[in-house]
Amino acid sequence: SGGEKVRCMLSKIMMGKPNVLLIDEPTNHLDLEAITAFNNSLINFKGTVLLSTNDRAFAQSVANRIIEITPNGIIDSYLPFNEYIVNEKVLSSREKLYK
């Protein structure tokens, strides 16, 4: 299955002990057990992880910095996701950058 292939690929990558991971939508096609295991491995990962995700719960659990790319610039913030989405400074920046 697609999820099994993703799990194998992620396991193979993590065993190589990289210091940077660049991953796009890593939780797609994974079941809850695999997402939890991957989440825990990212929390313990000592390197840098750049990821794109639409999974808010996943972002909240692993991200300590959020960089939002907009049509007119970027918003770079060292906030957990749940604080990022309600932060007044971020909301003001988003309003300006999405016009």
Predicted regions, residues:
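ABC ATP-binding cassette signature C-motif
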Residues: 1-99
